[in-house]
Amino acid sequence: MSFFNRHILLKVLSLNAIAVFVQFILGLISVNIVSVYLGPSGMAFMGNLRNFTSIFKSISIVGLKEGFIKLFIENKETEQRKKIFSSFLSFFGMITIVCSVISISFASKWSQLIFQSNQYSHFLILFGLLLPFFTFQSFLAALLNAQQFFKKLIALQLVSSIVIFAFTTFFTIRNQLEGAILILVISDVLLLVCTLYFLRKNEAFHYFNTLKNIDFTYLKSIQKFLL
């Protein structure tokens, strides 16, 4: 490894260490705030909600990062990359829409299951409506990863962690359980805003060429990464 590459690697590792440390500290503070303002029952409800949203998010992008990044790196031509991007985005977009419909259609039942009450069903409807933002943000993050913009990725993680922590703290103190639920539900929108800011001067937007670039060859290859 050359001196230049070694220097870059050390910088990336240092930034990553700082980001992990900051996220760890923010996590500890966040847990303490939630425990004080929500109590044991509120923390249990938030844990249930996190599990619920994690399941839907995992289904929405299952195999995305592995498949997209692998194919993107293997294909150097811009036109091929546009086809890969459009094909993956359309496929996972359809999966996300199905997940969104399920979340919205059974919101009352989910609310009863998670919170032992259906009075929070509107938050689960909101989650379903905003789920596509999560999928889109995951695509942009995968695109940064595929382009090996590791420093930008680490900076994005750091900034988004601070932003979400600030909103979580404010709304949890101000509105207790409803505030904490709201931020958990809309956190992906905040993350998307941060991601778009980091990508504002990036060539990533060259890959947005609508549905005309969908290639069924890549759609078939996606199934290999779903297992």
Where are these regions (language model features)?
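Interhelical loop/hinge segments that connect adjacent transmembrane helices in multipass membrane
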Residues: M1-L9, T195-L227
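Membrane-interface helix-capping segments at transmembrane helix termini in multi-pass transporters
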Residues: F3, P40-M46, N75-S87, I97-F127, ...
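Signature of the first transmembrane helix
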Residues: I8-E66, T96-S100, I104, S161-F165, ...
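Residue-level recognition of transmembrane alpha-helices
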Residues: N16, V20, G47-R50, F92, ...
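Membrane-embedded alpha-helical segments of multi-pass transporters/permeases
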Residues: L28, N32, I59-V62, S100-S108, ...
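Helix-loop junctions and terminal segments of transmembrane helices
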Residues: V31-N32, S60-K76, N145-A146, E203-A204
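Alpha-helical transmembrane segments of multi-pass membrane proteins
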Residues: V101, S105, Q116-L140, I154-L158, ...
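Hydrophobic alpha-helical transmembrane segments
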Residues: S121, I125, I154-E203, S221
